[in-house]
Amino acid sequence: MLKHIIPLIPSHRLYTEAFCGGAAVLFAKSPVEAEIINDINMELTNFYWTAQVYYRDLKTEIDKTLHSRDLHAHAAHINAYPEFFSPAQRAWAVWALCRMSFASMMDGSFGYDFGGGMPKKVQNAKDEFTEQI
């Protein structure tokens, strides 16, 4: 779909995405002077902000993450009570829930399979989380 959307975006200096979600368009288009994102889920916008401003802190948390039901439950707790946690902890919770939940849904149950694919999926996501995102 991006191959159809990106050519329709006119030349601009300010880009606003009111319903950010996965931010696919934002990351696929060329960067501009100012980019504004918003989403009904404040934790998503916190994730993108933290990845930009506190990348090292977030990367450290992500690198320590194992595919575990307990960590999934802890991430869900952080997501339910964000006011008690730092931006990096909240961003980690978003990352962990998206990577460890059934169907990658933040409000999904713990995802597992009998073939061992989920731990590999989490490890691959850890390896792919670089400053280039």
Predicted regions and their residues:
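Conserved SAM-binding loop and adjacent beta-strand
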Residues: 1-2
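SAM-dependent nucleic-acid methyltransferase catalytic core
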Residues: 8-9, 51-133
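Conserved S-adenosyl-L-methionine
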Residues: 8-69
